[in-house]
Amino acid sequence: MQKGAKNRLITIIICFCSAVIGVSIILYNLEKSIVFFVPPSKINEVEQGKELRVGGLVKVDSINKIAADKISFVITDNIKDLEIFYQGVLPALFRENQGIIAIGRLSNGKFIARELLAKHDENYRPPNTVIPAKAGI
């Protein structure tokens, strides 16, 4: 093998190995971020005090207003329930039987949320929007 071809081959091998190592490091670090939220039935698998997202349906008759900006409510995945405490402004779509994602920490079996995200279906229309009437109807 000629010296120039040998140097090119070594350079290609080094670049390939570097790329494999780089992708491996990125995937290893992103592993925890791939799951968007944890359902209440899997909450026992998460360590206490670690920030995470939990998601489920707001259980009917579970919303309790503690103060003007403090509430507690229960979410469920129809397997297990989880009580959530939240202080702040509620999303406009927050209501019973609605899907939500709460971001916060688990502490002594209670979830303390710092942010709530209300989920909606693919037919969502923001409040105060008018659906234009179709011609001829």
UniProtKB/Swiss-Prot annotation:
Keywords assigned by UniProt, alphabetized: Cell inner membrane, Cell membrane, Cytochrome c-type biogenesis, Heme, Iron, Membrane, Metal-binding, Signal-anchor, Transmembrane, Transmembrane helix
GO biological process: cytochrome complex assembly
SUPFAM superfamilies per record: Heme chaperone CcmE
InterPro entries recorded: CcmE, CcmE-like_sf, NA-bd_OB-fold
Species this protein is from: Rickettsia bellii (strain OSU 85-389)
Function: Heme chaperone required for the biogenesis of c-type cytochromes. Transiently binds heme delivered by CcmC and transfers the heme to apo-cytochromes in a process facilitated by CcmF and CcmH.
Topology class, membrane: Single-pass type II membrane protein
Periplasmic side, ranges: 30-137
Coiled coil: none
Cytoplasmic domain ranges by topology: 1-8
Keyword Membrane: yes
Cellular component, GO annotation: plasma membrane
Protein name: Cytochrome c-type biogenesis protein CcmE
Claim: Amino-acid biosynthesis is one of the keywords in the record: no
Subcellular location: Cell inner membrane
Binding site for heme: H120, Y124
Family: Belongs to the CcmE/CycJ family.
Transmembrane segments: 9-29
Main location: membrane
